[in-house]
Every structure is written in C-alpha cells, then in structure tokens.
UniProtKB/Swiss-Prot annotation:
Residues 63-281 form the Radical SAM core domain. InterPro entries: Aldolase_TIM, BATS_dom, Biotin_synth/BioAB, Biotin_synthase, Elp3/MiaA/NifB-like_rSAM, rSAM. It comes from Acidovorax sp. (strain JS42). This is Biotin synthase. Binds 1 [4Fe-4S] cluster. The cluster is coordinated with 3 cysteines and an exchangeable S-adenosyl-L-methionine. Binds 1 [2Fe-2S] cluster. The cluster is coordinated with 3 cysteines and 1 arginine. One of its GO terms (biological process) is biotin biosynthetic process. GO terms for molecular function: 2 iron, 2 sulfur cluster binding; 4 iron, 4 sulfur cluster binding; biotin synthase activity; iron ion binding. Belongs to the radical SAM superfamily. Biotin synthase family. Keywords: 2Fe-2S, 4Fe-4S, Biotin biosynthesis, Iron, Iron-sulfur, Metal-binding, S-adenosyl-L-methionine, Transferase. [2Fe-2S] cluster binds at residues 122, 153, 213, 285.
Amino acid sequence: MTSATTAPHTTQTLQFHPRVAESVATQRGEGWSIQAVQELLDLPFMELLWRAQATHRTHWPQGDIELATLLSVKTGGCPENCGYCPQSAEFDTGVKAEKLMNVQEVTQAAQAAKDAGATRFCMGAAWRAPKDRDIEKISELITAVKDLGLQTCATLGMLQSHQAQALKDAGLDYYNHNLDTAPEYYSDVVSTRQYQDRLDTLRHVRDAGINVCCGGIVGMGEAPVHRAGLIAQLANLNPYPESVPINSLVRVAGTPLADSEPVDPLDFVRVIAVARITMPKARVRLSAGRQQLGDAVQALCFLAGANSIFYGDKLLVTGNPDVEADTQLLAKLGLKGTPNQTTTETACGA
C-alpha cells in the first residue's frame, strides 16, 4: 500500500518596490517587512485590537476624530482605467463629465462643511495629471478655502515638481495620492499608469513641503499578502504619510470591479489596526465604503485606531453616511471631533 505524497507548502513572498526599498535602507532600524506586517494581520483578533488600541492611546491620548469633507470640484471624464473608479471615461457608470467648479461654488460648499464641524476640506478633480493652467485655477480655490479657516487638501492626479510647489505656495496643507494596493497586484487594478508614477508624485509633494495623504483600497480581489504589501509600502515611506485613508471598495455597476467579493468586515478592521500599529503618528482615516460597514464595524475601527472620517453625504460620486448619522454615531460612542485649527502637522517619523 502506497501513501500519497503531499506537495510542500510554499509561501508567496513580495519584494519592496525599488523606490521604497531605497527609502527603507535610509531610515532608522530595519523598517517593516511584509512578513512582519502579515504576522500582525494574522494575530488573534482581540490581541490585535489590544495592541492597536495601546498604540493609539500612546500617540493620540486626546482621542479626537478628525472630520474631513471631500468635494468633487471636477467630476468625470478621467482617461485612466482604474478598475474601481466610476469617474473613468472607459466605463459606462452613468457619471457625466463636468467642468471645474468656480470659486463661489467651492467656497459655499466649504463654508457649509465648516459649519457642520469639518476641519479639513479636500478638493478632488478627475484628471490623470493637471495642466499648469489647471493648477492656477485650483490654487485660487485653495486660497479661498484657506481663508475660511479650514485645512486644505487636494487630489488631482499625478504632479510635476513645479506644480507641487505652486500648490504649496497657494497654501495647500495636504495632497492625496493613494498607492491603492501592493505593487504586485497593481496591474490587476489599473494599467494606464505605473506604480512608480504614484511614488514620483508623492516625492514631489514631500519635496515641496506639503503633508502627504496616502492610503489604499481593501476588497478589490487582492490576497491577504497584498494587503500586507500595501501597508508595508506605506509604513516604509520616509517619512510615512501624515494621513492614511483606508477605503473599503464601493462596488459601482459598470466598473470592472463591480462584482468583487465584499471584504470580510473583521478583515477590514484588521487592516485599520495594523495601519495604526505601523504608522502610529498618522491620522488613519475611514474613507470610502463606510456606509456599507454599519455602526458596529465602524466602532471597532475606531477602537482599532481610526481617528479620522470623511464627513458628508457624498464622497466624490459615491454615497457616504449623512452628517446627522455621523453626529449620532460619534455621540453614541462618546467621541468628539477635532477642534478647528489650520496649522499643519509635522512629518511623521518612520
């Protein structure tokens, strides 16, 4: 009688993107390996939450929740093919291309956001990369919003170094440019730009002295090792981002990822917790997909170290809990919004 042989177990390994590998080599210590991040993700759930909460209390003893509002100032018609995005011109999602909003429209929206309690106002434009004339118009919006006493953020696509400097000169506090996922899974999501393009934009933003807002999306069909790879990439940026938005994929009909399997809610909480542990001084933001999480999962995310949310009933073109619902949730949990201040944060150490 012969016994069946079992194939040896193999473990998939990922390598840092060259730009990040170089950054890791220059920082103190050894940085975060993908294996180390994966080991955190694999901890027993309660142990992981305990570690994340302990880290959070150490670095954020005030326990406030930053309220940020995101407005699409130029919607639709983007030439990129990001598989999650309903604003791509490549997909039939019902989103129509619109022109850039004017200063009066944007300042009215920003004032309304401030009146509702928001302290940061982010302006998003569906461009692959803005032209210099676009930067001039966006700079006017930044100055106008800044004059209202709000922190300013923009997400406009890829930037050149002189454009980043122009935004800084206009008073921009934060620039958002997400990595989306690990580099090894990136081509499964988008093919119209390279991972290196994203890292180059982040470098231009950092060199200009603008705070970095950079995170990713969970639930795009990625494997657990890709989630570990994304977190390692973010945590090993030197310095790591001041703001780290973690999105749960909003599946929009017409996009290639519309039929993706929903992420397990507790797996999403795990990502929040590990982001907090690996980037202790960052604002970890609950971003897109909060509406589908529900109050209980959001409460676990706050326990795991999330301390920022996008505030308002719409994120670009997808739904978000309305202001009243968020106000009630925060009150139920005994959480308070961050006091309004326009001073920028110092860079986070890696």
